[in-house]
Regions:
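Conformational coupling and interaction surfaces
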Residues: 2-4, 18-24, 28-29, 163-170, ...
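Short, surface-exposed amphipathic charged segments that create phosphate/polyanion-binding patches used
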Residues: 74-82, 158-162, 200-202
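Generic structural signal for helix capping and beta-alpha/helix-loop junctions
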Residues: 39, 69-71, 192-194
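A residue-level signal for conserved active-site and pocket-lining positions in enzyme catalytic cores
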Residues: 61, 175, 243
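Active-site histidine-anchored catalytic micro-motif
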Residues: 2-46, 50, 91-191
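Short, well-ordered secondary-structure micro-motifs
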Residues: 72-75, 132, 156-157, 195-198
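Metal-dependent C-N hydrolase catalytic cores
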Residues: 45-115, 265-266, 275-294, 298
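Proline-centered flexible-loop/turn and helix-kink motifs
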Residues: 57, 115, 136, 180, ...
Length: 299
């Protein structure tokens, strides 16, 4: 039985790599929602749509939350992703895509959960949190894969939080309270997977397709940033690693835990005493994940 996914994306470079890998791996992408994060939400939706279309996927893309639950000001530009989330290679937002709250309402995500569609969330959890506020019963014991958390490494958010949690910590807290039971794939794990620059370069040299050339344009500054942050010659495709966790769960090890927001470090997650409310990925077969992602991306 093929994997069916609802995907939530904030339109960055690693989101694009994740979408391509999923579309080329036989996954049935049932629906996609966009959220603010690496760029503003309309741009994130446009990025997702053009990546999927160039990958041969016709899934509908909906425009979700443009700001977090607390409505804090959002800075659109992120180092490594650029103003449009794709370092100038993003889709055109001139075509207005349908909003998530019409015609389905945020019930679109609840419907996915009720129908047994798996979830993959690669940005701030605002859309999921809003959906859980309206229909909490739909998400009881749903186990979406969520790219979130930085436990023993530092992320790019204030206090060392990962960017997704830092962007809307209230949303993640709400999701944990709802009983969703997410499978968290933190930076501790995603930072162990490297896709080498040469793999992107060879693909760009061997293929002149618009998709490959756009990805090559997008990954350049992203690789530069990762070289400075993490070392090595390549990038840590954080969201693509989360996608790999949905695709190949046998390559990832999880531990049940009770997690919450650290009150002293804004947006940072910590393990605390209590009944498990999430599963935390603690180990990954990094070399095999890297190999499979490269094969999915470049053939």
């Amino acid at each position: 039985m093929s994997l069916r996914l609802h995907i939530d994306t904030d339109g960055g470079v690693d989101d694009a790599l994740a979408l391509v890998a999923l579309a080329r791996s036989g996954v049935e992408i049932a629906s996609v929602s966009a959220v603010f994060g690496n760029t503003w939400v309309d741009q994130a939706a446009s990025n997702a749509r053009w990546v999927l279309r160039l990958s041969g996927c016709a899934a509908d893309v909906f425009v979700g939350a443009e700001a977090g639950l607390a409505l804090r000001p959002f800075q659109h530009r992120r180092p490594g992703h650029g103003h449009d989330g794709m370092n100038g290679a993003g889709g055109s937002p001139r075509r207005r895509l349908p909003p998530l709250d019409r015609p389905h309402g945020v019930g679109l995500i609840a419907l996915a959960a009720r129908q047994g569609v798996s979830g993959l969330f690669m940005g701030p959890l605002t859309n999921l949190a809003r959906a859980s506020l309206e229909d909490p019963a739909a998400f009881h014991d749903w186990r979406p894969v969520v790219m979130a958390g930085a436990f023993d490494v530092d992320g790019q958010g204030h206090g060392g939080a990962d960017f997704n949690t830092w962007s809307d910590p209230e949303a993640l807290q709400r999701v944990l309270w709802t009983g969703v039971n997410p499978r968290l794939v933190p930076l501790d794990v995603t930072s162990k997977v490297l896709i080498e620059t040469d793999a992107f370069r060879r693909a760009a040299e061997n293929s002149q397709t618009p998709l490959v050339q756009k990805l090559w344009q997008a990954v350049g500054p992203y690789i530069d940033q990762h070289r400075a942050l993490w070392g090595g010659e390549g990038c840590r495709p954080h969201d693509a690693v989360a996608a790999a966790a949905a695709l190949w769960p046998e390559l990832f090890t999880y531990e049940p835990a009770h997690v919450g927001l650290d009150p002293n470090r804004f947006g940072r997650l910590e393990r605390i005493d209590g009944a498990p409310n999430a599963e935390i990925c603690t180990a990954v077969q990094a070399a095999e994940v890297s190999r499979r992602l490269a094969h999915a991306l470049f053939g």
